[in-house]
Amino acid sequence: GRINGSVDWYLRQTDDLLNNVITPMGSNFGNTVLTNIGSMENKGVEFNLNFIPVQTKDWNLTVGFNGTFQHTEFTKLNNTDAPDYAIQVSSITKGTGNLLQRHMVGYAPYTYYCFQQVYDQDGKPIQNALVDRNKNGQIDQGDRYMTDKSPNPDFFYGISLKLSYKNWDFGFNGHGSAGNWVFNDFASANSTSNIDINAGNLPNFARLVKKTGFTKANSGEQWYSDMFLENASFFRMDDINLGYTFNKIGNWKGSMRVAFGVQNVFVITDYSGGDPEIPGVNGIDGSIWPRPRTYSLRLNVNF
């Protein structure tokens, strides 16, 4: 038929994840031991749809779409039920000794663990002003909070299209995601003019300096502010191709196809950094090499 597809629901339980756990006194040479104890649950819905809206003698159009809704969280990390137990991971450029993310039961892997930024009445961040969440009169590690945001997308998808008219053909492929968050570490490390002035780089301010207006030295806590946490949902047009096939050239019985293509055509996103697709698993953007856009001209000959 002209329409076909499938839908699958999945539930995957991963057990025996490695973690260091505290051992009883005298039972081991150290006070912790690496053991298989953690568990993680991954569930979601996958679907794909292919349909042919146009099919005539001269015209053919085929469209494909696939997507996955997913939810991942830890269900066990150690041998106790302590609700505040967490494994801290992932360092950033600035700050000393503090890690940006946590693995914690009930949360997705690499959930961001940040300070909450304070803003003025115009919505601009106030430098070194963070919310005293534990109400102890000072800003300390107890004021950081689990943001419930992670680099793991809630939904990711792909789309393809193929269109032909007589000897012409056109097609594209794209993909994207929604609900994935990136910590803009480059922005965090370059958010104040104080750094650039001291480095002798006055003409080369990061764009964020103009946006924040920060002029003093950042506090150790400011580097971990949730103001640098950004929704990195995106759509990327991976490639576009246009071709023409010559079925007969004079007395020659072969065929020849000429095609022009572009890869990494464009990206649609609200993320302010260079690229919303961050290599690795932790979603921390310390400034990556840009992906090149490639143009190609292809010639295929069949004898």
Segments predicted by a language model, with ranges:
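Flexible, solvent-exposed coil segments and beta strand-coil junctions
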Residues: 21-32, 44, 134-142, 212-226, ...
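Conserved small-residue
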Residues: 35-38, 52-151, 270
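Short sequence motifs at beta-strands and strand-loop junctions characteristic
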Residues: 37-43, 149-154, 221, 227-236, ...
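Extracytoplasmic gating/loop element in the C-terminal half of outer-membrane beta-barrel translocons
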Residues: 177-263
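C-terminal beta-signal and terminal closure region of outer-membrane beta-barrel proteins
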Residues: 34-42, 87-113, 119-124, 198-200, ...
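Outer-membrane beta-barrel and related beta-rich outer-membrane complex signature
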Residues: 17-21, 61, 69-89, 179-207, ...
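Outer membrane beta-barrel strand-and-loop segments of large Gram-negative receptors
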Residues: 6, 10-55, 116, 144-148
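Membrane-embedded beta-strands that build the outer-membrane beta-barrel scaffold
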Residues: 1-11, 45-53, 61-69, 157-163, ...
